[in-house]
């Protein structure tokens, strides 16, 4: 990996692959939310001047070929979120962004923590362009409570029903909760009671393929060797869940893979974008910065997701022409 000086100028301490062939890992960062916007793959990670451990702002990166990544500057900073200090906590950090789009606008959902001494919270900010600037909605959308940590938001629009769902939760309590959003994308319509699937810890992600809904999520301590990605399937976006097993686990070279996104390219190929530690010493807890990687996803004939082989290969190349696919819906 090479460092782009433009990132330092933008105040984002993330290392991005420079022009040329980018091999895994792609750049430093954690909790990557990825989505296709036009003919570009966009990645929204946790990171900032304090790295992913003490982030006070969000940035984004985009690529047309998965070889050259363009830093898109700051989306929003902690000091632009007016309500963030109203809980009296001595410090606040931002992590785990999730982005959704509706009606030509972009909605950035994010976690504010830590959980102690006050509950973690989820906020949402709005922009007319994916690179922002984002304007916060003015109030927290979700607040944690005893047994539930309000973290790791992910928004999914079910194209069958048109309903918009917010998935969140994990870590302390390891509880999944789901809400239906109002069409304005910044208000809660109601909470939908769901079961927490087996081995759920945090980082829920929902996508649909061929009428089957896939709920994938991270399991284990975030900086430990058992951190991994598992999944369950369902006939609806809210269950009932059928646990299917782990699809992304650590190996001798790559540790703690998780907090991921699924993306489908215009030609129908599927990718998983996730963070991991590479060559981390010892059995954990791991330290230092995590890195973002991209690997291929394949499905068995019965619809199961095949286990992912983590690679240090070139990232899959985006096709030259942008088309439309109906196989997977994650927006």
Residue ranges and their predicted role:
Residues 1-4:
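Positively charged n-region of N-terminal signal peptides that target proteins for export
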Residues 7-15:
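Bacterial N-terminal signal peptides
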